[in-house]
Amino acid sequence: MSIPFFSFSWVVMSNLTYLQGYPEQLLSQVRTLINEQRLGDVLAKRYPGTHDYATDKALWQYTQDLKNQFLRNAPPINKVMYDNKIHVLKNALGLHTAVSRVQGGKLKAKAEIRVATVFRNAPEPFLRMIVVHELAHLKEKEHNKAFYQLCCHMEPQYHQLEFDTRLWLTQLSLGQDKI
């Protein structure tokens, strides 16, 4: 009696974790790219190279520049950093937190943005999409229409970049080479 062989990529491909909620026609195209091992090539052609914001200091400056360009009246950001505790291949891509502390007789709020370390080696547009998303939470806490309108105001290609970032994460989860 022979046991059928199922490849790892078939199992992962069948559910496409990062692409849940997208139309089946689109998922079919992604499955074809994966089967033909062309997903990485397509992404590399569209997004050649990585960014130069590999340190926490550079990421902070990058985030501040975007905030100053689009959200001057938003509360200040006290900390921006890459965080290796964010398990991007399991849950979040970035985190925004508002930490409230008692200082003297007053309550002081501090905003923090943390980005998964996998984005240290990502193409710059993917990092921009994550930072824009987290910055939008300074004004809009929930993922609602106003939130996504703000994301699109800061990055007109936001939805395409989100999809392509999900493709890139799918590629990484399959163990294929990074761009």
Q: Where would I find each of the regions flagged by the language model?
A:
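Walker B catalytic acidic pair
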Residues: 134
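Walker B beta-strand of ABC/ABC-like P-loop ATPase nucleotide-binding domains
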Residues: 131
